[in-house]
Amino acid sequence: MEGPEAVQRATELIEQRLAQEEETEKLRRSAPGKLSMDMLVLEEEKRLGVQSPALQKVKGQERVRKTSLDLRREIIDVGGIQNLIELRKKRKQKKRDALAAAQEPPPEPEEITGPVNEETFLKAAVEGKMKVIDKYLADGGSADTCDEFRRTALHRASLEGHMEILEKLLENGATVDFQDRLDCTAMHWACRGGHLEVVRLLQSRGADTNVRDKLLSTPLHVAVRTGHVEIVEHFLSLGLDINAKDREGDSALHDAVRLNRYKIIKLLLLHGADMMAKNLAGKTPTDLVQLWQADTRHALEHPEPESEQNGLERPGSGRETPQPIPAQ
């Protein structure tokens, strides 16, 4: 292979490698942004997971690609495939660093003078400003103060993972199962944020781990949709109802399959999730597997609990990636 064909093949390999690495990185680092409070948010979370453009790529949407063959050849000739991969990764990291720097809140003042209003108090719960929280509560403010969406400081701090603020709010009487306008509690928000330590703290203060939002989603549903494996594993260790269904009759396994959460699928199966459970559309998890989900279909058809643990293949198993199996 030489000339244009070699360049084309090399470019395809680059893009495949980058897509794989970006997918892995996004799943590992996924930190949900601030969510607008309407029913569309919950419905989109159910269908796509929180902010999951990577999922759309897996489903077959093509990225916009440069078409200049000369440009491709020049790029590859500069330093080879690996150098190009590293260069593009560094550029992406620089963009992430610049974005993080722009979003970083201003430093907290040494001393809070004057009263703290409700808006400032709620904003402090997001930004982790403990002194503002202390001042508001010391002046007699309610720990259950909420905004127009009934989101409290406890909800906000749970999403962000601010443990010290959470403990302070709970010590000052914050209602641990306070429901916002979508019936989400701090437990739901902690699952979205991916903070296992927050889940454990809320649980130790009596939070309901089976509470439902307006989609009838449990915290387990939310953890599955947002891809937080450790939280899913924690809930399963508690013996929660693994087959609990939401408003559309979907179990956690339905959601995991729909979003191609491979490790979570394996975890659910190893803990006895019902593969034959039907949702309101009459579909089982296996029915939802798309052709592009070869690994997922294999997991459903060959659970192999004796050789799998925590969603990972046994070291040295040597099992090849299964080929797609057409849906029946």
UniProtKB/Swiss-Prot annotation:
Q: Which GO terms describe its molecular function?
A: chromatin binding; protein kinase B binding; RNA polymerase II-specific DNA-binding transcription factor binding; titin binding
Q: Tell me the SMART domains matching this sequence.
A: ANK (SM00248)
Main localization, broad class = cytoplasm
Q: What is this protein called?
A: Ankyrin repeat domain-containing protein 2
Give the location in the cell.
Cytoplasm, Myofibril, Sarcomere, I band; Cytoplasm, Cytosol; Nucleus; Nucleus, PML body
Q: Which gene encodes it?
A: Ankrd2
Repeat region (ANK), residues: 116-145, 149-178, 182-211, 215-244, 248-277
The annotated subunit structure for this chain is: Interacts with ID3; both proteins cooperate in myoblast differentiation. Interacts with TTN/titin. Interacts (via ANK repeats) with TCAP; the interaction is direct. Interacts with TJP1 (via PDZ domains). Interacts with PML; the interaction is direct. Interacts with p53/TP53. Interacts with YBX1. Interacts with AKT2.
Instruction: Please verify whether the record's keywords include Metal-binding.
Output: no
Q: Which Pfam families match?
A: Ank_2, Ank_4
Q: Which domain of life is it from?
A: Eukaryota
* Gene Ontology cellular-component terms listed: cytosol; euchromatin; I band; myofibril; nucleus; PML body; sarcomere; sarcoplasm
Q: How is it modified after translation?
A: Phosphorylation at Ser-68 by PKB/AKT2 in response to oxidative stress induces translocation to the nucleus and negatively regulates myoblast differentiation.
Query: According to the record, what induces this protein's expression?
Result: Up-regulated in response to mechanical stretch of skeletal muscle (hypertrophy mechanically-induced).
Function statement: Functions as a negative regulator of myocyte differentiation. May interact with both sarcoplasmic structural proteins and nuclear proteins to regulate gene expression during muscle development and in response to muscle stress.
**Keywords, comma-separated and alphabetical:** ANK repeat, Cytoplasm, Nucleus, Phosphoprotein, Repeat
Residues that the record marks as modified (Phosphoserine) are S36, S68
GO BP, sorted A to Z:
myotube differentiation; negative regulation of myoblast differentiation; negative regulation of myotube differentiation; negative regulation of transcription by RNA polymerase II; regulation of cytokine production; regulation of intrinsic apoptotic signaling pathway by p53 class mediator; regulation of myoblast proliferation; regulation of transcription by RNA polymerase II
**Region Disordered: start and end of each range?**
96-116, 297-328
* InterPro entries linked: Ankyrin_rpt, Ankyrin_rpt-contain_sf
Q: Which PANTHER family match?
A: ANKYRIN REPEAT DOMAIN-CONTAINING PROTEIN 2, ANKYRIN REPEAT, PH AND SEC7 DOMAIN CONTAINING PROTEIN SECG-RELATED
Q: Tissue expression, per UniProt?
A: Expressed by myoblasts (at protein level). Expressed in skeletal and cardiac muscles.
